[in-house]
């Protein structure tokens, strides 16, 4: 399994992400995009995101992930989404592991953080297996955890 990243998201791949996400409904979209992005998801919204990376397995587009912001020596990532038909095959684990390595290539970054909703147990398990630890719980509007991994 060869995972690679490309900066940005093509129109064709943005269309695929919209199809995958919109077919799973508004509450699903809020879990991976956050509550500020209107439903249904559109190509334009995806293409306007800064720091977005397309994830490929070989030549096949399989998902995306975003470098959201940098706070001092911490890089916050999110909007990590793998094609639902490809989930459960280890792609997410491989992609996350490789993306974390890519982020840590920047020597100014000492830690990586992300948010995960309490109800998203599958994602929490993945993040914990990859060395992320819960550092904070946020209650409003829905309980979520801030998880962090240090170098």
Question: What name fits each language-model region?
Answer:
Residues 3-85, 96, 102, 106, ...:
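Acetyl-CoA-dependent GNAT
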Residues 76, 81, 113-115, 146:
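Conserved beta-strand segments that form the floor/walls of ligand-binding pockets within enzyme
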Residues 83-85, 89, 118-119:
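Active-site acidic-Proline motif in GNAT/NAT acetyltransferases
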Residues 90, 107-108, 131:
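Short glycine-rich hinge loops at helix-strand junctions in the catalytic core
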Residues 93, 118-136:
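Conserved active-site alpha-helix within GNAT-family acetyltransferase domains
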Residues 105-115:
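Conserved GNAT acetyl-CoA-binding A-motif
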Residues 114-124, 140-144, 150:
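Conserved beta-strand-loop-alpha-helix junction that forms the acyl-donor binding cleft
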